[in-house]
Amino acid sequence: MANIKSAIKRAKTSEKRRVANSQEKAAMRTAVKRVDALVLEGNKEAAQEAFVLATKKLDKAASKGLIHKNKAGRDKSRLAARIAAL
């Protein structure tokens, strides 16, 4: 445990950010998995609606630095290709 006051504050802040970041990443992964599940079912309309939400989550995670912007683009491209193949 930190002894210096500023280090204690930084530890608290880091823990809060770690929890928030992990929640944001989990929501992003869930949105992507939902699109994949709908594609496997063959439900194109629902998959397109879920794709909009997944795109939003991926872009937000990339802008916050949770994932690299290229990974966000790659994931969006792959999801779009799967939907287009339906």
From Swiss-Prot:
User: What is any one of the record's Gene Ontology cellular component terms?
Assistant: small ribosomal subunit
PANTHER family from the UniProt entry: 30S RIBOSOMAL PROTEIN S20, SMALL RIBOSOMAL SUBUNIT PROTEIN BS20C
- List the InterPro entries hit by this protein, alphabetically: Ribosomal_bS20, Ribosomal_bS20_sf
What is this protein for, i.e. what is its function? Binds directly to 16S ribosomal RNA.
Q: Say yes or no: keyword Protease present.
A: no
Q: Which keywords does the record carry?
A: Ribonucleoprotein, Ribosomal protein, RNA-binding, rRNA-binding
Q: Can you tell me which family this protein belongs to?
A: Belongs to the bacterial ribosomal protein bS20 family.
Transferase keyword on record: no
- GO biological process annotations for this chain's record? translation
Region Disordered: start and end of each range? 1-25
Q: Which Gene3D superfamilies match?
A: Ribosomal protein S20
One GO MF term: small ribosomal subunit rRNA binding
Could you tell me what this protein is called? Small ribosomal subunit protein bS20
